[in-house]
Amino acid sequence: MTFEQLIPLIIMAFALGMDAFSVSLGMGMMPLKLRQILYIGMTIGIFHIIMPFIGMVLGRFLSEKYGDIAHFAGAILLIGLGFYIVYSTILQNGETRTVPIGISLFVFAFGVSIDSFSVGLSLGIYGAQTIITILLFGFVSMLLAWIGLLIGRHAKDMLGTYGEIVGGIILVGFGLYILFPI
């Protein structure tokens, strides 16, 4: 692979990773330990490897209409997760909040990475080099997720008890933006 071929993939990796950054910014406003931030970033990175890989494999066999379904499903997952965070924050009123562990971490990572499935479909149709592409997507998304989580963690301290609600609203807003781009 030449440098000229690598540049578009790097740009695409950052574009996909910005989704992870934006959503992680909101998620970082939850009470997270550094170990949880590490796991969340790694999980997002792994999903950004798995989802485009599946998309690239299926992209050679499926029509382009499934890209719209993946896009829609990712948006709905983010909106649902955002509403859940706002709801649980208001309901629990100062108690320990739900943090993204177990199945909720996988739902979160899946929702953030589902757009990379659509990109994988397109790249599979065009025959992009699979290994380099998916590793680049995973690494950049993991790095940007960590940055977003850490910035969100510090922003939470400035926002006080409303930080988690703001984080949930960011997730809902991002999901709505995916559904209805301006």
Swiss-Prot record:
Gene: mntP
GO cellular component annotations of the record: plasma membrane
Record's subcellular location: Cell membrane
Protein role: Probably functions as a manganese efflux pump.
Pfam families from the UniProt entry: Mntp (PF02659)
Membrane topology category: Multi-pass membrane protein
Signal peptide location: none
GO molecular function: manganese ion transmembrane transporter activity
Name listed for the protein in its UniProt record: Putative manganese efflux pump MntP
First-listed, main subcellular location of the protein, grouped into a coarse class: membrane
Membrane-crossing residue ranges in chain numbering: 6-26, 37-57, 71-91, 101-121, 131-151, 162-182
InterPro entries recorded: Mntp/YtaF, Put_MntP
Keywords, in A-Z order: Cell membrane, Ion transport, Manganese, Membrane, Transmembrane, Transmembrane helix, Transport
Family affiliation: Belongs to the MntP (TC 9.B.29) family.
Domain of life: Bacteria
